[in-house]
């Protein structure tokens, strides 16, 4: 089902309600959650209603909740697999040369990208640790009907831990730069010549950082954060998710962090 934050055809939510009967009572219990919060998802149990439960009732309900969780995880894995096959098949047919107004506006080149059948559309591959394509990020020539200049495709893709590599294979001891968006990654590589890892958004920096630590042991990791100084949380309070997520990822995987510095009413990305 659709969950908070879903756009387009995305449906990352799930729920299950079931009935349990003992000799004299009927209980209703269940769970709900969203896969948007990662591969393990967010899983919330609903408090059973219908009266006081025995220890046996609680064990039965616990077993059913765990079974429901495993069932949903299997469904999600199947959706990821279908999306990956679909994306990989389309990727093979896309041309390596083309034009993108998005890239021109950002003043970056196409590094490992391909171009869509719709004029002006560029696509960034999303790969997992095994280098399998799990999906793509579409960079539109102009914002779409929802006002978005970027969108993930196809529905059901596994975004957590997915990345795009730019530049040479890093030798032991060399620096690896990790960032959010493609334009930022391309700008960093064009400026430094270093290996850059695009994680697509701030929330994916930690999963991608863990994957890169496994792939590239002995390298220096530098998390290049967006400076989201204009952002506020749901309460309207200042919140800088770009810096927060980058610092947390660096501390967890063992790395350093940095963000762009501007004067006055500043910009917020390395591309700027």
Model-predicted regions and their roles:
Residues 1-102, 228-230, 235:
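Non-catalytic accessory segments of DNA primases and related replication-initiation nucleases
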Residues 171-174, 186-272:
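TOPRIM fold recognition
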Residues 79, 120-219:
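Phosphate-handling DNA/RNA-contact segment within nucleic-acid enzymes
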Residues 95, 100-108, 128-130:
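Serine endopeptidase catalytic core focused on the charge-relay Asp
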Residues 110-115, 134, 222:
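Phosphate-handling catalytic cores of nucleic-acid transaction enzymes
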Residues 22, 38, 116-117, 128, ...:
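Acidic surface patches and DE-rich sequence motifs
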Residues 2, 113-124, 265:
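Short linear loop/turn motifs
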